[in-house]
Amino acid sequence: MIRLIASDIDGTLVPDGAPSINPEYYEVITALQQKGIIFCPCSGRSYQSMHTLFAPIADSLYFISENGTILRTEEKILYTWPVPQEYIRPLVEEGRKLPGISVMICAPDKTYCECGEDGALYRLMHDDYHYNIENIPDVLAVPFDQILKVSLFHNDDQIEEVCKPLTDSEWSTKVQMLCAGTKWLECVALNAGKGEAFALLQELLEIPQEETVYFGDNMNDISAFSEAGASATVSSARSEIREAADIVAHSVKHDGVLRELKRILEVAPDHI
């Protein structure tokens, strides 16, 4: 019996950076909820971006945002996992040294960049992802007390190669550095992640792990796979993820997750 479903967004429910989702997801998720099954989007996106994507049903969802560093509902923040304050300045400064990298820092209610409003990063986050984002001269001018994530962006899809000097350094023992797609390296607290947030949600809802499913397509989803009763991915996912998953659905282009949700709906009892 399945009582809780969580899913990554980009590369799993929608193509990377898509500003909208197949509206049939709203219908199927609502039908699952009517049978007592809870749905939780789980993404590297900000809460504001996720809320926009799921606007017609957002008031009925849990949200795991910013790569597992904040768990909330529409009404209330339930938990946050901020980056240790002493790491933020040196981490940003290291990111600035890397060729072609733009730095972005993420707080619970706002995101900050320093690339200019005509820069590729700002335009992507503002126009496509619908972030509440502000361009400022220096992201280090923002208070450090609730920084959830430091993100490094490379517009030419070479994030792993460009950031290798950072990921191979001592920084790997201070923060988690997770690749999300081919443009992003997400730096979060060591005790943060999608898996940690998904596990806490299960605890708060008193739902055992074996009654959960998690859908994801990238390396930042691996921690959530280990916290799920069943792990699922799409055929367009990275090979490492396909090998780790219990279920491989059709590609994101062919709404593989939507098909799996319909299968779950078909076999679910009328109400849990």
What are these regions (language model features)?
Residues M1-L4, N22, E186-I272:
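Mg2+-dependent phosphoryl-transfer enzymes with acidic/Ser/Thr/Gly-rich catalytic loops
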Residues M1-S7, T30, Q34:
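Non-catalytic pre-domain segments flanking phosphatase-related domains
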Residues R3-A18, F225:
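Asp-based phosphoryl-transfer active-site loop
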Residues I9, G68, D217-N218:
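Active-site metal-binding loops of divalent metal-dependent hydrolases
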Residues L13, Y79, V248-A249:
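A structural signal for hydrophobic residues in beta-strands of small regulatory alpha/beta folds
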Residues S20-Y122:
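Active-site phosphate-binding/coordination module
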Residues P56-D59, N67, W171-T173, E227-A228, ...:
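Short, structured coil segments at secondary-structure junctions
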Residues E94, G100-F215, M219-A224:
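Conserved acidic, metal-coordinating active-site core of Asp-based
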